[in-house]
Amino acid sequence: MEANPDDIADAKTSAFVEALKQAASREGFDICRITHPHAIPQAPERLRAFLDNGYHGDMGWMARDPERRAQPAELWSQVRSVIVLGMNYAPAEDPLPDLRARDKGVISVYAQRRDYHEVIKKKLKNLARWMVAQSQVNVGVDVKVFVDTAPVMEKPLAAAAGLGWQGKHTN
């Protein structure tokens, strides 16, 4: 009996996805999911309504290039998959008790640590290098990494990948 090429491809893909999740975990990511770049067909309409209603407030940058923002393929035409990763960046200790001490100022938690953009981007680049190295065996890979710094709708993509949900009245 001859092996079905689709079954072989599915097995290779499954093995790669599992290896990817393990590599992401080694980099400190708590969760790793993959979705299709066209998994958020409602995004352009929802983004347009959000902008038309002025919900973006003073964030004028959100209104620039809404088509690129709403669909990953508009931002990068060669995109085939979107890997969505999550990392808990919370402090080890609960900062809320500090707020009860009214006689002293409190520095916001995010300002006490290294900029998460830098921390996470370094880890993403390490993971991207791992992916490229793995692909040398089979087929070439090109990877783009973003840490909420590109016009990508992270929330709908995360929901499409199975990382929670997005509320009706959120951007």
Please tell me what each predicted stretch does.
Residues 1-171:
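Auxiliary alpha/beta "docking" domains used to position bulky ligands
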